Structures are given as structure tokens and as C-alpha cells.
């Protein structure tokens, strides 16, 4: 444990853009309350159980993982501590849901994306502000930020009231293909591979749908990770936002016929 803490602290010193240091997402640090204005929480409507994270990309639209979909769910914006109702938080319902169904040059691994139109726009405040879509694709070796209300212990299921943040590295896709042979990942894909190969830092269950932010840009959506979480040499998979920009922007613009990306 002492060694893990030392390694984590050395990594943190190298992260120039991070607003708050994180040792581990599993048992790690609480996100700075001003760091996640775009992070939303999805809840199952009837049970009021927490499902997933998501990202507010403008006042009326949220991007999350398709596997987070339920027949009825709620979206909370501006939340920090889930156990306390905050004056500035806002609740919305899905008005429309869109799923990425393009077939050309996209495999099943490239389609875990859901775009949600809210029933009414949110009002920006000091705790609510959208995160812009990326202007360019991410580079391997980038330092990336992940956050969410997912498990802080694994395999034990411990969910925190506040979001936890961590810094991980964007890895070459081949690293995930080699490390995760049971998935039989295709030779080429539009998913991102990210993690800390030494282990101890990772997203986990219920972090699904949340953002992967690399060098300050929204580059990925939490998609899949090994169980237990944070194992050495077991990185996780993220949907690549940049390769879905045409689809996202076409829907937001109101196009009824969406052209699939090349």
C-alpha cells in the first residue's frame, strides 16, 4: 500500500492539468466540486437506484453509454453529494434517445453510445456547465481524467455519495487486445484503451457512461472494464467520441436522415 501511494503521488506531480490529485478511483479522492459541472447522474425511475454517469454537452443534450439505457430513467444535473439535495441541482427526463446503429466500418464494440435529448434545457449556474465536444482526436500517451459515482472497492460493491476522480493514461489499442484476449477484439476499432498498467487506478461498475477527458478535451465514454477493477495489466475500454462527431452533430442539428461517419 505504501508503494502504491508513492507511485500514485509521483504520477500526480506530472499531471499539469489536473485540478485535484487522485490516488485511486477505487478508494480514492473526492472530485473537486468545481471540476465536474458537466457530469450527470442517471437513476432508474421507479426504484430511484443510481445507474450510470453521463456528460452534458450542451444545455439540452447528454452523451452516455447505450448499455445504461432503461425504459424509464431520470437525469440529475449539478449533483455532487448524492445523499444531499443541492439547491442548484436540476432534474430532467429523456425526451428523445438516439443510438448509434451505423454498420459501415463500425463493429459492435464501436456502438455503445446513447445521445439523450432532455425534456427541457438546463439552466447553467456555478455547478452546471456543458463540456465541449473534442476538436481533434486524442494521442496515445495522453494523461486522461475519469470521474464518477462508481464503485470505490472491488470486487466488493461500495458506492460513494460523492464522485471520485482519477488520472489514467491513454494506451495503444493493441495493449487492450493483448491484455484482454477473452474479448476477441477486432484488429481495428474506434474504441479507446486506457488505464494504469501497474494497477490500482481504474474506473469501475456504475462509472459507465461517464467522461474520459484527455488534455482537457472530452474524448471518451466509460464503456467496459475487467472485474475486479484496477487489476495490473488490465486496462479498460472507452467509446471514442471524436469518431462519432458527425453522427452527434447531425442529430443535434435536427437532421432526420443521419449520414454514418466513414
Swiss-Prot record:
It is found in: Secreted. SUPFAM superfamilies: Trypsin-like serine proteases (SSF50494). Disulfide bonds join 31-165, 52-68, 102-260, 144-214, 176-193, 204-229. The keyword Signal applies. Keywords: Blood coagulation cascade activating toxin, Disulfide bond, Glycoprotein, Hemostasis impairing toxin, Hydrolase, Protease, Secreted, Serine protease, Signal, Toxin. Residues 1-18 form the signal peptide. Its main location: secreted. Glycans are attached at residue 105. One of its GO terms (biological process) is proteolysis. It holds the Pfam family Trypsin. Residues 19-262 form a propeptide. One of its GO terms (cellular component) is extracellular region. Residues 25-253 form the Peptidase S1 domain. One of its GO terms (molecular function) is serine-type endopeptidase activity. PANTHER family: KALLIKREIN-1 (PTHR24271:SF47), KALLIKREIN-RELATED (PTHR24271). Belongs to the peptidase S1 family. Snake venom subfamily. Monomer. Thrombin-like snake venom serine protease. Displays a specificity similar to trypsin. Releases only fibrinopeptide A in the conversion of fibrinogen to fibrin. Shows coagulant, esterase and amidase activities. Reversibly increases the permeability of the blood brain barrier (BBB) in mice. Induces the barrel rotation syndrome in mice, which is manifested by gyroxin-like, rapid rolling motions. This syndrome may be due to its effect on BBB permeability, and certainly also to other actions affecting endogenous substrates present in the endothelium, nervous tissues or blood. This is Thrombin-like enzyme gyroxin B1.4.
Amino acid at each position: 500500500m505504501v508503494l502504491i501511494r508513492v507511485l500514485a503521488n509521483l504520477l500526480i506531480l506530472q499531471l499539469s492539468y489536473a485540478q485535484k490529485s487522485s490516488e485511486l478511483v477505487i478508494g480514492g479522492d473526492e472530485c473537486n466540486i468545481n471540476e465536474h459541472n458537466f457530469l450527470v447522474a442517471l437513476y432508474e425511475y421507479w426504484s430511484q437506484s443510481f445507474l450510470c454517469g453521463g456528460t452534458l454537452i450542451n444545455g439540452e443534450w447528454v452523451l452516455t453509454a447505450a448499455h445504461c439505457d432503461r425504459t424509464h430513467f431520470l437525469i440529475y444535473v449539478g449533483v455532487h453529494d448524492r445523499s444531499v439535495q443541492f439547491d442548484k441541482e436540476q432534474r430532467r427526463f429523456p425526451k428523445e434517445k438516439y443510438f448509434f446503429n451505423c454498420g459501415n466500418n463500425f463493429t459492435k464494440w464501436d456502438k455503445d453510445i446513447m445521445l439523450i435529448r432532455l425534456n427541457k434545457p438546463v439552466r447553467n449556474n456555478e455547478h452546471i456547465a456543458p463540456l465541449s465536444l473534442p476538436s481533434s482526436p486524442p494521442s496515445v500517451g495522453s494523461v486522461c481524467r475519469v470521474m464518477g459515482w462508481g464503485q470505490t472497492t472491488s470486487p466488493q460493491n461500495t458506492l460513494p455519495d460523492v464522485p471520485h476522480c482519477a488520472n489514467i493514461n491513454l494506451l495503444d489499442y493493441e495493449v487492450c487486445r493483448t491484455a484482454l484476449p477473452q474479448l476477441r477484439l477486432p484488429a481495428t476499432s474506434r474504441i479507446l484503451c486506457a488505464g494504469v498498467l501497474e494497477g490500482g487506478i481504474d474506473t469501475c461498475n456504475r462509472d459507465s457512461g461517464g467522461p474520459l477527458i484527455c488534455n482537457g478535451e472530452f474524448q471518451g465514454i466509460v464503456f467496459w472494464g475487467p472485474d475486479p477493477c484496477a487489476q495490473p495489466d488490465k486496462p479498460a475500454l472507452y467509446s471514442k467520441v471524436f469518431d462519432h462527431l458527425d453522427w452527434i452533430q447531425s442529430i443535434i442539428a435536427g437532421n432526420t436522415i443521419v449520414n454514418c461517419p466513414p
